A protein has these predicted regions:
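Amphipathic alpha-helical scaffolding segments
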Residues: 81, 85-93, 113-114, 217-224
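Intrinsically disordered, low-complexity acidic/Ser/Thr-rich segments used as protein-protein interaction/activation
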Residues: 107-115
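Predominantly late transmembrane helices and immediately cytosolic-facing juxtamembrane segments
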Residues: 101-105
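Secondary-shell segments that build the walls of catalytic and ion/ligand-binding clefts
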Residues: 1-49, 114-242
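Arginine residue identity/basic-tract feature
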Residues: 54, 58, 88, 110, ...
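Long, hydrophobic/aromatic-enriched structural stretches that serve as scaffold segments
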Residues: 40-99
Length: 242
């Protein structure tokens, strides 16, 4: 569903209005220095939030649009895989910028989520490894470089700073193999960051579990985490806030 349609359909919803206002705030307070890859476009703000990405062509704003689609797809359909998409999107766009600036010419989008864990932690991966060629060895080096950046250290502080993180994401006790994205996040945030044993496992999606999360303002928490992460990402890419 297009994000502008979501806002239209749910314009009276307080959570939707809250997120829309956050997008407006982001547009009004963020800027990026001109670079060879991404030149500033000072075009006027358009009412259609869905056009924001096309107007500015800024990777982090793209993340924000993707995040908004994810949250409100989750909100309207009760699909609870949004955390995976948030982190995957954040990683992919950051890596695309990194690759572009390094002029490596690598098609990063060929990498799917499970590749990340294989490249980051070859020995411990629970997935079947692919045949590595020179391009994937290059991916490995660049991804290792990517996750060592200050942005991810700050993100780690954000998501682990509140007690609600463990309150909401420590429910699944089943011994299941983690997904690639989960392995990636574990490599970045530490082995005690047990996402797979929580929201990313489809087996946790019982009616009672979902109802509990709705009652406990799950979406407000998700929005708060996503907003703080993206603010830090904006600063990292030379955006500034008043």
């Amino acid at each position: 569903m297009e994000i502008e349609q979501i806002f239209k359909d749910y314009e009276q919803d307080e959570i939707v209005k809250k997120f829309y206002n956050q997008l407006v705030y982001l547009k009004n307070h963020a800027f990026i220095l001109d670079t060879t890859e991404y030149k500033s476009n000072k075009g006027e703000w358009e009412e259609s939030v869905g056009k924001l990405m096309r107007i500015y062509m800024r990777p982090i704003l793209t993340i924000y649009i993707d995040l908004s689609n994810t949250i409100y797809y989750c909100y309207t359909s009760q699909n609870f895989h949004s955390l995976e998409v948030i982190f995957r999107t954040l990683m992919e766009h950051h890596a695309q910028v990194l690759f572009t600036k390094n002029k490596k010419g690598i098609d990063f989008l060929k990498l799917q989520g499970w590749y990340y864990s294989n490249l980051l932690d070859e020995k411990k991966s629970t997935e079947k490894l692919v045949q590595y060629d020179d391009s994937y060895k290059e991916h490995y080096k660049l991804i290792k470089q990517m996750i060592s950046k200050p942005l991810y250290k700050k993100v780690k502080e954000i998501v682990k700073s509140g007690s609600y993180w463990y309150q909401y994401f420590n429910y699944n006790e089943k011994n299941e193999k983690p997904s690639g994205v989960t392995n990636l996040v574990s490599n970045i945030f530490g082995k005690d960051f047990k996402i797979m044993y929580t929201t990313l496992s489809r087996s946790t999606h019982s009616v009672d579990f979902n109802a509990y999360r709705r009652e406990e303002n799950y979406y407000d928490i998700l929005l708060s985490i996503g907003t703080e992460i993206l603010k830090e990402a904006l600063k990292y890419f030379r955006y500034e806030f008043d």
